[in-house]
Amino acid sequence: MKIAMTTKEASEKWGISQRRVRVLCRDGKIEGCIQKGKLWIIPENTKKPADGRIKGKESLLELIEQKKKELDIRRPLTEGEVSKLHEDFMIEYTYNSNAIEGNTLTLRETDMVLKGLTIDRKPLKDHMEAVGHKEAFYFICHLVKNSYPLCESVIKQIHSLVLADRPFDRGIYRRIPVRIHGAKHNPVQPYLIEAKMNDLMKNYAEDRRNIVIKLAELHIGFESIHPFIDGNGRTGRLIVNLELMKAGYPPIDIKFTDRMRYYDSFADKEKMIKLFAEYLNRRLDQYLQILG
């Protein structure tokens, strides 16, 4: 008589993905499951666990606000603690944000480059992008400390650090038309960039809605303008984190493995809101767990 089942068998039995079964095992939501190496063994008669995930954008945004309030109660972290959290976050964030744009460094290689090492047979450009992104992240941390408002000048400064490998294009709006492969719409013409960026900053400054909603719209708007010749994606994601941290939230790290979902979200504001909200919700959980 069979007394146990694999995650694949549980997935088929319960009608959920195998990945979801593994997550439930890892989070202790499946009673009696045992991990053996990389495998999970689940008792045959175990009932399907309740799906505790938050459904719907509004309820997830409400949950984020609740967790933010809880985080505020447990603070403040010391400057050293914040610095350590940012350092740990920055390495993987730099890897993911650069990888989304085609950088070939692995996570381990990115870590090594940020420690001053050189990776054999990897382009100098990839090394410089890693270092530039690191500097840009620490720059936005400085901006958060000093409560600098978001403006075009700040965005250009962020971009000038991101584009470490292109000194003549750093912090300068493009002067030629560009096309984004796979995009449904072309970025605005160069002569419209100044006006469009001015409108984007004005609308964002006047927006009083939930931080996740307005940042999703800001990000889509910024990337649709595509103001720089290169480095728009990395700069745009740094802007999102700058504003999250200024509002007292932890920064988010959109994973390279999630890039297709991220790309698809540019065509649907609701998808981008949901993507940002899910990442922010998980980051808040991490911070709350650290603080006990």
Regions found by a protein language model. Give the residues of each.
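Beta-hairpin "wing" of winged helix-turn-helix
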Residues: 33-35
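Minor-groove-contacting beta-hairpin "wing" of winged helix-turn-helix DNA-binding domains
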Residues: 37-44
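FIC/Doc superfamily catalytic core
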Residues: 1-13, 18-29, 44-230, 234-292
